[in-house]
Amino acid sequence: MTLLQPYLPRGGVSASPYSEAGALYALGLIHANKGGSGDSTVITFLTNALRNAGVNEVVQHGSCLGIGLAAMATGNPELFEDLKGILLLDSAIAAEGAALSLGLVLLGQADSPLAQNNIPELLTWAH
């Protein structure tokens, strides 16, 4: 995270939302598929960035993509609910990132109760 630190959100008002969103996405790429290894520092950081993004849909988009990559194939129900909450907002930009990330988090989890209970509902939202 040291390399990306100047570009990552620091809380408060975003000076450059596109740089911050790109840095959050890059953080997810760097830590892709490591979410199940026990170290959840990056996922926690990305989740906090998502929650602190407020109505900034660009930062929400980058946070969602970062979460999806870092938590790939974990089937984490808390992350699923956070991403689903963004998906149901009236923002096409943020919802696109959330939808892609939901697929990444549920990767390989098709038989899990989380997927079985939620996929039919998610398909009703598909356009």
Segments from the language model and where they lie:
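Mature, well-folded catalytic/scaffold domains that follow N-terminal targeting or propeptide regions
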Residues: 1-127
